[in-house]
Structure formats: C-alpha cells, structure tokens
Design a protein with these regions (language model features):
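Catalytic machinery of carbohydrate-active enzymes
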Residues: 1-323
Length: 323
C-alpha cells in the first residue's frame, strides 16, 4: 500500500518511486485523496487506487479506522509518502507489518522502517525514490500515460483538437510569491498563434478571468470547470504549456509537453520540471539580471520585501522566445 501525498505536483513526483517498486515485483495499490487519485490512474504500474474519504486538516480518526478495517490483512508493506502523523496512522491501524517512511511529527513509533529527513533540500523526486531503500538514486523523470481513448473522449468533451491550443496554468496554491503576474500571462496569450486554455481550480477562476479580459478573444477560462482527468488529457495534447511552479507544471513535464516554467520564491533545484522540452525561467541564476536576487529563493508565500522582483521582472517576451 502506498499512502499518497495530497498535492498534485507531489503525486507526480512519486512516479519514479512507484516504477522502481513495480520493477522489483511489488503489486501497488495507492491510497489517495480524490483530488489527486486521477494522477495515479495515469501510472500504468499502479494496479489499484483507493479513494480516501479524508479532508484537509484534522486526524479524522473515525474515517481512518473505517478504512483500516476495510483493508486489514490485504497488505504486507506500506510506504507512507507524506511526512505527517495522520498519514502514518492508517497503516498502523490496519495492522500492516512493514511501514516505511521518513521521520517527522513524532511518528517514530508508527513506522517500522524509518529514514531521516535530509538536511539539504534534494530534488523531491529523489527524496521520494529513497523510500525504495535503494542507494545512489537520481532524480528520474516522472512519466504519466493516459489511454488514447480517454484522451480522445476528454478532448471531444472540451471541443479540442490535439496540438491546436496552448495551456496556461497561472495559479499556485502556495501563494502569490509563486504566481507570475496575470498581465504577463495575458501578454503571452496575445503573442501566440494558437488559442489558450486557462486551467486551474475554482479558486483560480477570478485570476483566469483577469487574464482572459486582458487578452480579448484569445483565452477560454476552464478553471474549476474540468475534472482532473480532463485537465490531464488537455495538458497531454497541448502544443505548449506555460505555468508557475505548480502541480500542473509537473503534469506537463510528465507528459513531455513543450513547456515554460516560471519560478519565483521557490527553487528549480528542489522541484524542477523534469522534462527535456522544458525551459525554466528563474532570475536567481541569471547572471545578466542586476542587481542580483540575493533574497531568492525565500520559499515564502508572499514577498517579505514587498517587490516580488523575482516574478515581476520576467517579461512576456522571454516566455514567447522560449516557446
């Protein structure tokens, strides 16, 4: 049993771990929250996906005990990918004898095979892959695959033709210090020769409306209007994807789509889009940008200095040139 992370990007970055486990003969069932479960259904090495009925926050012991009773006796090993206490509870309650995970949140007694959290910030793909117990791991590229029939059905439902559009994912759940300005996204939309789909959650609908209004006739706002499966399919068949450091950035990378990823407060050394067709724009490592961004990466939700130069100063022309 694999206990999945709760964010789309993190879920994508676990794929190389699951590939390693499957290659050595382990039959994989993934337990995931409903909003990330479709990501695991796009991984052929996953035999089964259990949708966990949990919500953000709280231990929700009653719900965890109920699931534990349902899966008791089915699994010999659990890989607990999140570092939270509550994530490690279910395998214990289900009586799974081998429970593998990183130390954290006072869960030393909940795990039987414990890894220490690295003091540096390794690439997240390598961080997850280390749970396999194998040494010398590198950050392998995550790969997602959807059955062609599912892609065709999703594109037909959205009225799309493969390669006939670009996708913008302008949101970033973490906070505004990871979001490239709406005006910059709109400028890119005006400069492209294909229509643009704006994808994201319902929380990002207003942001996408702002972009669409600034690029009249160029954008279709689908934020909050698609299933995650439809969003995955749309990204997989897009000509280009432009995004911040977000979950949908990792989805585009895993499908090998041509993409530009704009980084601000976070670091592409930690969560890069592992894709040969990706261009990363990050002013921190641009020697031509002056004065240097000594403040980056700050990993803050909002710019503590109030200027957000790391994002504001990446103009639309650089993105268009990269596409």
């Amino acid at each position: 049993l694999v206990i999945a992370p709760q964010w789309i990007g993190d879920a994508v970055m676990t794929e190389p771990l699951l590939r390693r486990l499957a290659a050595r003969g382990e039959r994989l069932t993934v337990g995931a929250l409903p909003w990330v479960a479709p990501v695991y259904r796009a991984m052929p090495q996953v035999a089964d996906v259990i949708d966990f009925p949990f919500q953000h926050g709280g231990l929700q012991l009653k719900a965890r005990r109920a699931i534990a009773r349902q899966i008791e006796g089915r699994f010999s090993t659990a890989y607990v990918l999140p570092n939270s206490l509550k994530s490690a509870l279910l395998p214990l309650l289900a009586g799974i004898p081998k429970r593998v995970g990183y130390l954290g949140e006072a869960r030393v007694g909940l795990l039987t095979h414990r890894l220490k959290n690295p003091k540096n910030k390794p690439p997240m793909v390598a961080f997850y892959s280390a749970l396999s117990g194998e040494s010398g791991l590198e950050a392998d590229r995550p790969v997602l695959k959807l059955p062609p029939a599912e892609v065709d059905a999703a594109l037909n439902a959205l009225g799309l033709q493969p390669g006939g559009y670009a996708v913008f994912a302008p949101g970033a759940e973490f906070g505004p210090a990871k979001r490239w300005p709406a005006a910059h996204f709109a400028a890119v939309a005006r400069g492209l020769d294909v229509p643009v789909l704006l994808l994201g959650s319902g929380k990002e609908a207003a942001l996408c409306d702002e972009i669409a209004a600034a690029a009249p006739g160029r954008c279709t706002n689908l934020a909050g209007k698609t299933t995650l499966l439809q969003a995955l399919a749309a990204i997989s068949a897009a000509r280009h994807v432009v995004s911040n450091d977000s979950g949908l950035m990792h989805v585009a990378a895993a499908f090998g789509v041509r993409q530009v990823a704009v980084f601000g407060s976070s670091s592409p050394l930690h969560t890069p889009p592992l894709n040969d067709r990706a261009t990363v724009l990050w002013l921190k490592n641009d020697p031509a940008y002056q004065p240097p961004l000594d403040c980056a990466p700050c990993f803050e939700r909002e710019c503590p200095l109030g200027h957000t130069r790391c994002l504001n100063d990446i103009d639309a022309g650089r993105v268009l040139a990269s596409l």
